[in-house]
Amino acid sequence: MNLDGNQASIREVCDAGLLSGAVTMVWQREKLLQVNEIGYRDIDAGVPMQRDTLFRIASMTKPVTVAAAMSLVDEGKLALRDPITRWAPELCKVAVLDDAAGPLDRTHPARRAILIEDLLTHTSGLAYGFSVSGPISRAYQRLPFGQGPDVWLAALATLPLVHQPGDRVTYSHAIDVLGVIVSRIEDAPLYQIIDERVLGPAGMTDTGFYVSADAQRRAATMYRLDEQDRLRHDVMGPPHVTPPSFCNAGGGLWSTADDYLRFVRMLLGDGTVDGVRVLSPESVRLMRTDRLTDEQKRHSFLGAPFWVGRGFGLNLSVVTDPAKSRPLFGPGGLGTFSWPGAYGTWWQADPSADLILLYLIQHCPDLSVDAAAAVAGNPSLAKLRTAQPKFVRRTYRALGL
């Protein structure tokens, strides 16, 4: 077995100046089969990409927050069918837009309260500024993230929902709301709860919402492509050195390949990693089980046919039909689960092969409702976007899967 060929697509985009660098891992049956360290974590400084590089993992944060919430479910402090107003009374009088892209003052009442399960499956009717269009998009972009969770939630509660709770999937701030609820249940800062309930037990010592002064040198620089397809690094500032005023439960974590591998191994291992139990088998089963109806799957997701051969558990995509999923999303047996991050971070766990793949980069993309079409129309972006699927397909082929 030779896995070296899975690097080719990544090295190609790095050599073409479309990507700064990447760290990838292939793990199977309790063995780390491969680690690729490609390119640079800081091009200008000439610092090579290394295994211990810290990445902004964006929405790969979401399953970690969900795991913290499910640990509360395990203890009977929270239930999936609980109305969120029990801990978030700000959202007790939600209205629904008559037209999702229409005026904010044209609404009708919500048929029911938002449930915890609605948050975990993004069926609450909440949104992101980039997942919707019109006045509601602009309103989401003005939310005050820098003033703490209570101020942020109060502002969010003034916005109408884009659809009825439970009707369909709209990618949203739902997990940020979940983070506020988890913090209120435990009466503690979110970073402390996630550390005590997930990161600590799982042995994820390099993961958090802030990066110590000593570890700052390991943080990967964020890049974007300008109009001439040249890499620019003036995208984001350095990591927080102390806990931020509002820990972004839906996208604020930094992590390393080794750390996140431990988290995914925990999910693949029914809640345990290296003999330490983090979650109950039932909570992990719930996270990894498709919960969407056929009607919900008829709708596109961020402009793409995301649900072909796939479903959605508790913030995890789940392969339900490998034959239908494979042509669009690459190889992965029944029950394969995953959730990516906006900056190109990606992972997949395939129970049928006892296999985990990790692919970590730092690239700031175009985030819009038609982002999928924008990528398809730009050869450079399409080339960059296909580097990861080629890595996956070549890995599966080399493993004889």
UniProtKB/Swiss-Prot annotation:
InterPro entries xref list: Beta-lactam-related, Beta-lactam/transpept-like, Diverse_Enzym_Activities
SUPFAM superfamilies noted in UniProt: beta-lactamase/transpeptidase-like
Top-level taxon of origin: Bacteria
Cellular component per GO, a single term: plasma membrane
UniProt-recorded name of the protein: Protein Rv1367c
High-level lineage: Bacteria, Bacillati, Actinomycetota, Actinomycetes, Mycobacteriales
